[in-house]
């Protein structure tokens, strides 16, 4: 089957092949997918990162054979930490999670363009994982995402939802998770609420449904670290009874631990 590499900084993945459709996730520059269907200039894709299905426009992609995509994935072993590069006279930002190929002191993009890092950093995934694991996951999430706006379907600090925050945080730690909180809850070890530690994942059902609709990191001293539309983005907030986030307590469904502390 044909495949593709995201060549735009962010490629929105939508529920339908039309620009006003709901965004359900994103392909970040350098991430890959299999093309499963066509509709004019739209491509239905199954993302290689997490198997998510949706539609994105061909303009966001470099289409290629499966062999070419596999070769790219073997070479693109470096990740952006929010770097910017110079391409000729142009400055191009690379969002956190963008995957590129490092060649000496230059960065190679999926479409063949080359640039030099002028701010931020680009590191191999191995280096990034070692650095990330030196910090607690919830602290890393705050360091890179605090103040990021809430965006349904987003996975980067340019805009992120609750499960995107969790997925990206653990991706840089070398732990692959599904895209949605309803699937993330099946990963890790079940923990009682009384045994909750900072860094554990807290899963909540909706106000009018038993389905899981929200995930947050447990923080220190009865706090949550999460991306929430109610506060406009990613933050740390108390969730003791009587606080705004305290209303979530009766909706807690599960606590899961992905890493021992």
Provide a role label for each language-model segment.
Residues 1-2, 18, 25, 31-32, ...:
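Boundary regions of SH3-family modules and the immediately adjacent low-complexity/disordered segments
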Residues 149, 155, 205-214, 228-233:
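Active-site loop architecture of trypsin-fold serine endopeptidases
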Residues 149-198:
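Catalytic cysteine-centered active-site loop
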Residues 43-46, 214-218:
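Short beta-strand-centered aromatic/proline hotspots
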Residues 63, 125, 189, 219-261:
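Aromatic- and glycine-rich peptidoglycan recognition patches
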Residues 23, 89-90, 189-192:
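Short, conserved secondary-structure segments in the cores of folded domains
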